[in-house]
Amino acid sequence: MSTFRLTAMTAFMVSSLFLVGCATENSRAVQVAKVDSAIGTFNGVRYPVSIGKFDNRSSFMRGVFSDGVDRLGSQAKTTLISHLQQSQRFSVLDRDNMSEISQEAKLQGKTQTIRGASYVVTGDISEFGRKEVGDQQLFGLLGRGKTQVAYAKITLNVVNSLTSEVVYSARGAGEYELSNREVLGFGGTASYDATLNGKVLDLAMREAVNRLVEAKDAGQWGQEVAR
């Protein structure tokens, strides 16, 4: 083997080891937003509620090529349960895992004491959409930019479980934007960010739950079953 080839191979191996040695891994915890009423302590009565049907009524992910699985509605329902529980105003009763819960009670050799809900909270995603807005400077030579926008609107209905009366309705809406700009070849435009779907859905849900809690605290609903 020639001296030149040996030197080249050695340099390649050294550079490879250098690149591997420079690999870094970073992680950080991200603060999760909560509804307004989650802050502080609430000493009042928590109303028992269960969650009814929650569907995606928007045209998003409901086209001819959809597999029929309502993932957006399922995600919204999970988010609703979390925010209602964190609001400190409701005792949320799980109705989606009844068989699993029953099995665990049997394993403990105990009889279940399932609690009934005074209200059933139902709702839907009435509006949901994504769009991209772009611009260019001097036909893109000086720079270009792209903004991804996600919008969602949530509707919640509170139903009296004894009378089936809708005692209160609340709505919440939110919009998220992600912008990137490239100037004279520096910077870049981000690809499609699917996390915006969850972020804007969570934002709209928080707004709807905030309105629900505010109305309850103001006595606009809930008095008929207050104990």
Task: Walk through the language-model features, giving the residues of each.
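Short, solvent-exposed, polar/charged sequence segments at loop or secondary-structure edges
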Residues: 72-73, 85-139
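Amphipathic beta-strand/beta-sheet edge segments enriched in Tyr/Trp
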Residues: 122-187
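Extracytoplasmic
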Residues: 44-49, 75, 79, 85-87, ...
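A structural "domain/chain start" motif
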Residues: 22-92, 97-104, 178, 184-227
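A generic local secondary-structure boundary/capping motif
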Residues: 38-40, 111, 143-146
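Bacterial N-terminal signal peptides that target proteins for export
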Residues: 1-11
